[in-house]
A protein has these predicted regions:
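Solvent-exposed, well-ordered loop and adjacent helix/strand elements within mature globular domains
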Residues: 1-97
Length: 97
C-alpha cells in the first residue's frame, strides 16, 4: 500500500488494491460487479475509468451516515459518497468502471 500520495493513476490504484491517504483507507469496486441501488445517481458516467456524477465528483461508497459527504481523494479530484459501503468511517470505496 501507499501512504499519503496525491494524483495516483487508476492503473496504480488497481495494482496496489489499497491506498491510505489523509487518514482514509481507499479501496475500489467495479460498478459492474457492485451495482448497488446507491449508484442510481443523476448524470452518472465513467471518466478516465472512475465513476463520476454530473458534477464530476468520483462516486464513493462509505458508512451510511456519510452519504453525500465530499472528500479529497488521492486521484486529483474530490469524491462524494452516494452508496452504502464499509462500516469503518475512515474507509472509502471508490467506484470504477
Amino acid at each position: 500500500n501507499i501512504n499519503n500520495i496525491n494524483n495516483i493513476s487508476l492503473d496504480d490504484f488497481i495494482y496496489l488494491g489499497v491506498i491510505y491517504s489523509n487518514n482514509y483507507k481507499f479501496t475500489y469496486a467495479s460498478q459492474r460487479v457492485a451495482p448497488g441501488r446507491g449508484l442510481n445517481i443523476p448524470g452518472r458516467h465513467v471518466k478516465n475509468g472512475f465513476v463520476v456524477d454530473k458534477d464530476d465528483y468520483i462516486v464513493l461508497g462509505a458508512h451510511p451516515d456519510l452519504r453525500y459527504k465530499i472528500y479529497d481523494t488521492p486521484f486529483g479530484k474530490q469524491g462524494k459518497v452516494y452508496d452504502a459501503g464499509p462500516i469503518n468511517k475512515n474507509h472509502l470505496n471508490v467506484y470504477i468502471e
